[in-house]
């Protein structure tokens, strides 16, 4: 797909995206847009961003041939983009470094964030400590219970973790509360959104900070295999790790791009978090327009996933647009498929993956078995699974 360019000047990716917020937030978002437009044209801003990614985060993250897993499963060769090896254990820190640099540039002394699995909360607390800012992290009460290790990490890093008891007590509700807080303290507070969603300019900004993943992968796969992968695949909740991998590949027409949503118990039940795969209509949530799980009255539906980080009823607007123009295919992995993949990566590769990332390997049979052993699938291993040990143990009936 040549000459891909999005968003437009109003923050739309096709018919998705935009700016749907209260009047009180418009000035803050316009201030942010102006600051980001200035920063992205400033070579020194990007030079400092790259320095921190190298010396603080530990980039580039390697690509790794999962040879034993590939042999066991059959079909295409599986390569992993090892975002789990970043400082803080996931891809989230790529974005929080960029937004913290922008917050400092704007003179903000306090950052707030929402988090589901806790990885974005940890990454936000980390950069707040790194740059000498105070931080408050909003987290659904149910997610706090299933992600206690990350809650403690955030507190160790100096963050104030605020539990959200409203609604479904998960990521959607944490984002609601964070946006309310931003309205109340917009003058001194910078809201670090963790996913490629939210009102403009956040989806573009998060994508630009995360596309280091795909840019590195293109160079690394060329060096390691002499060519680009046949398929590049990533899990999708809001979609920041996926857009980070996909964006540099969009114009590479020979590379199939596949996003994996959370199938939960099954998309034929109410218990999933797969707006595109389930055929959800377009709606507005958290300041942007996109495919959204909702009832006939436009009320946002509850979601379910074994993975807290994918437990979200919407999807980033660029993903919805890429689905519309048929550049990216979207599929699902169910809870049981993700848990099986979690075990396989542990046993065959000595890698404990995040449950979010496990969905990608868990969806692989649908694609991989149709491919030959000389073909390559690049999997974005978006995070490590330390945070999920308690959840997996509980599901296995093991008391830690």
Curated annotation (Swiss-Prot):
Swiss-Prot/TrEMBL catalytic activity: (1S,2R)-1-C-(indol-3-yl)glycerol 3-phosphate + L-serine = D-glyceraldehyde 3-phosphate + L-tryptophan + H2O
UniProtKB keywords: Amino-acid biosynthesis, Aromatic amino acid biosynthesis, Lyase, Pyridoxal phosphate, Tryptophan biosynthesis
Pfam families for the chain: PALP (PF00291)
Enzyme class: lyase
Any one GO molecular function term: tryptophan synthase activity
Pathway(s) of this molecule: Amino-acid biosynthesis; L-tryptophan biosynthesis; L-tryptophan from chorismate: step 5/5
SUPFAM superfamilies: Tryptophan synthase beta subunit-like PLP-dependent enzymes (SSF53686)
Residue positions, PTM N6-(pyridoxal phosphate)lysine: 92
InterPro entries: Trp_synth_b_CS, Trp_synth_beta, Trp_synth_beta/beta-like, TrpB-like_PALP, TrpB-like_PALP_sf
Cofactor requirements of the protein: pyridoxal 5'-phosphate
A GO CC term attached to the entry: cytoplasm
Keyword Amino-acid biosynthesis: yes
EC number: 4.2.1.20
PANTHER family referenced in this protein's UniProt entry, alphabetically: TRYPTOPHAN SYNTHASE (PTHR48077:SF3), TRYPTOPHAN SYNTHASE-RELATED (PTHR48077)
HAMAP family: Trp_synth_beta
Quaternary assembly: Tetramer of two alpha and two beta chains.
Family: Belongs to the TrpB family.
Protein name: Tryptophan synthase beta chain
